[in-house]
Amino acid sequence: MNTELPGTEHLRFRQLRHFVDHLRRRLSEPLPGLDAQLRMAPNPRMWPEPRAVLRPAAALLLIYPHDGAWHIPLTVRGATLRHHTGQVSLPGGRLDHPDESVEQAALREAQEEIGVAPNTVEIIGRLTPVPIAVSGHLLQPVVGVVQDRPAFSLAAFEVERLIEFPVARLTEPGAVGSEQRVRPGTPRDVQVIPYFDADGARIWGATAMVLAEFAAIVHDLEEASRARR
């Protein structure tokens, strides 16, 4: 039996389009960029050498409605991967060939890693690229949206588990923590690592920097919405 009131589905669709339209418009304007990213960057951060040639890579920041709130799918990377094993990340990877766009690569990786069909995703913009010294990549985050929660299917060897992360948590008080770690390759060089908490999993590094910029954009949209009331 359908317990939804008449027009509920239409109202939900209108709310979805309203948010997406405002987000698309904000992504077409100057982005928060490095200033926002650095709020979640390890300190001191490992930057690539000035003359380093970074290989292009892409990641999909996908937003979808679930349980009455917007969510982002994040993956805990499998233990057999070459880089960033066990870390929380967005679905993504390097471009397969020179003719592949970052949008195509992001959609392909999301399909391979978490089973999201590319034809269900509406690409609405890009965030600021993040250079990653450890893997030698320049990561281009791509923002996409789907109307409904995807039927996720995880790649067994690449993804240990899926985290459905609420967008609202990015701007909640107390969302950010930090810890100290010894910097890789040094005996005493300590880094302060900021992180978002995701049900006990810590989101740090490049993924946290991407989410920090997205959080700044969400904050802008929230402020604009309050100003219109």
Question: Predicted regions: what is each one?
Answer:
Residues 1-89, 94-112, 116-140, 145-149, ...:
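N-terminal leader/linker segments that precede catalytic domains of diphosphate-processing enzymes
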Residues 154-184, 188-197:
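NUDIX/MutT-family hydrolases
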